[in-house]
């Protein structure tokens, strides 16, 4: 479903992570996002998870925004996390549109989770780039059972622990703790 929403906007879609390992270290996310960025041929690269969606009606606005801010290294979008059809939250603002044409040296290795864009070793801050009012919708929890969510959260907690030596705010390495 998510891939379909990108087709009207994108010249190409690079799909990564099909052979995602069951157990991994947290920095794996940034490495595969970077591989996709590096292999992309377009002027702009959207760093999108498979559960991120644009609404079709927003695609013409997104195209105009990309043209308007063609000298910016990134564009930040508000991200809405959808839990159920009637329950959601504004999760964050995130730099998802990355200007590869003007800034091919962007890396996806920043922030606390090591996947946010950096330029010359410095995090591209949401406050330093254009912020648009076109939301990205994250439907992660909507399409999965509680059991699958718990299993995935435990797997991600173990990856975090391998990277940083603790579980942080992720609970623990079992579905019951995560």
Language model features with spans:
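Alpha-helix N-cap/loop-to-helix initiation residues
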Residues: 22, 54-55
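The conserved acidic donor/metal-binding loop of glycosyltransferases
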Residues: 49-53
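Active-site-proximal specificity loops/subdomain of glycosyltransferases
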Residues: 1-47
């Amino acid at each position: 479903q998510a891939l379909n929403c990108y087709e009207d906007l994108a010249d190409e879609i690079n799909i990564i992570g099909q052979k995602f390992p069951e157990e991994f270290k947290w920095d794996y996310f940034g490495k595969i996002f970077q591989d996709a960025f590096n292999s992309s041929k377009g002027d702009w690269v959207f760093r999108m998870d498979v559960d991120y969606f644009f609404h079709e009606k927003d695609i013409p606005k997104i195209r105009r925004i990309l043209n308007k801010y063609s000298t910016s290294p990134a564009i930040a979008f508000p991200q809405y996390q959808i839990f159920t059809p009637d329950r959601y939250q504004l999760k964050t603002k995130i730099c998802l549109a990355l200007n590869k044409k003007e800034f091919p040296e962007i890396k996806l290795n920043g922030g606390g989770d090591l996947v946010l864009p950096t330029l010359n070793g410095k995090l591209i801050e949401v406050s330093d780039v254009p912020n648009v009012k076109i939301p990205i919708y994250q439907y992660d929890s909507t399409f999965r059972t509680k059991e699958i969510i718990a299993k995935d959260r435990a797997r991600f907690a173990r990856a975090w622990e391998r990277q940083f030596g603790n579980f942080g705010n992720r609970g623990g390495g079992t579905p019951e703790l995560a």
